[in-house]
């Protein structure tokens, strides 16, 4: 009996220690995940509203499957306004006041650049959805991941398509002076130069809406091709103001920002926007998985839109991959979530998401730059074109690259 009396307390103590350990790493229900989105100007409100809807659908779908660690999740969405200082403040609020255990979403590169240090310093994992700037992953921070393409990679698709267009010898690039626009414009200019094509870049501040002066300067250059790297409503306004001046998508070969994939907003704001080219992330709808088709149907039903935008797909997957990582970690501890993310294979609506480079393998081992740290390597990037006035974005003609091509581009002489 004496031995039994000693053993029982030890068993109880062990159980209590295990229980306390679990409690230390598990959040109280619901488990909160932050969601970054630009929901007011000067940010891309069109993009932010799409991302918000997608993240809320992710919350719904994850909870319908049992949530994480036995809890529902709650996606706490915050408005970054597309501004770096606001983004840093909102990241701080999500962590210190809202109690999130990880963060997804993010549209503007400036938001990613400004907010990542806040999250990393506090040990909160972030999976950025649509922030392209290479430096976001380039400084190899422990808690920062990305499923959007690298700016250098995405910009390469834009300039390579422009370079192969017939008769292109000169290009004008109109870009916003942000962490997205500046490096993207530089990559395009460098790439075009490698093909013997001259380019001139005009920069404008985020929030600019009157482009009359810039349009006249662009016209004076008489370029064969125009690349517009202005996000959100600014991109709409430039395109229509250029069209009004006789130098829009129906007057010259014209690349517009991907915010134009929200076709209802595009045609309302740019009625002369037919024949514009745009970059789109993700495979065409005809190649969607069953889960992507279901999401697209639900998204269209909720929003009244004709299709789901690439940045909405990215936002959905950013929440989904975080939720899976928390489950696989068996914990809401930041270090445990990072370990799970570095080993994850997530069947997302964009495809299989994984991160080949991190603490176990440096990008340099495969001859890659540091920007590939915690970077998903497989996002599909296509060039699409509106070829009928008023057509929905999900039927746009894919004109590049050859592997996804559904039709020939229409070039304006």
What are these regions (language model features)?
Residues 301-309, 323-395:
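Segments of small-molecule ligand-sensing domains
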